[in-house]
Design a protein with these regions (language model features):
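Rhodanese-like catalytic fold shared by cysteine-dependent sulfurtransferases
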Residues: 2-35, 44-76, 85-118
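Metallo-beta-lactamase
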Residues: 79-81
Length: 118
């Protein structure tokens, strides 16, 4: 019984698992000014439109560049891409590097309306 209680408390405390898209958590995290927003799409995709404040770093380059953006491992980080697949891989990379507050926001097109002035 104790193990079940701990399991349930853990599920409540940690939200989405690595790789899972959690746009609600991402939008909430983006209300915090210290949150780093990373777009892992290609340069061409980014040029077609990006979320305000997003920094473009493709997933293979994350390990090389993340330290400059987020030196503290508890920095909140939100990642997104075109469909959610690359942002899932990016979340895995960041968590593998020790970042503890990474949220996969999924697809740009489903996030963009939350940032429109309408």
């Amino acid at each position: 019984m104790r193990a079940l209680t701990l399991l349930l408390l853990g599920a409540l405390g940690f939200g989405a698992k690595a790789g899972e898209i959690d746009q609600a958590a991402a939008l909430k995290l983006l209300q915090q000014p210290e949150t780093v927003l990373i777009d892992v799409r290609t340069a061409d995709e980014f040029a077609e439109g990006a979320l305000p404040g997003a920094v473009r770093i493709e997933t293979p380059d994350l390990a090389r560049h993340i330290g400059a953006l987020a030196p503290a491992k508890d920095t909140p980080i939100v990642v997104y891409c075109r469909s959610g697949r690359r942002s899932s891989a990016a979340q895995d990379v960041l968590e593998g590097l020790g970042y503890s507050r990474v949220v996969n926001a999924g697809a740009y097109e489903t996030l963009a309306p939350a940032f429109s002035p309408d």
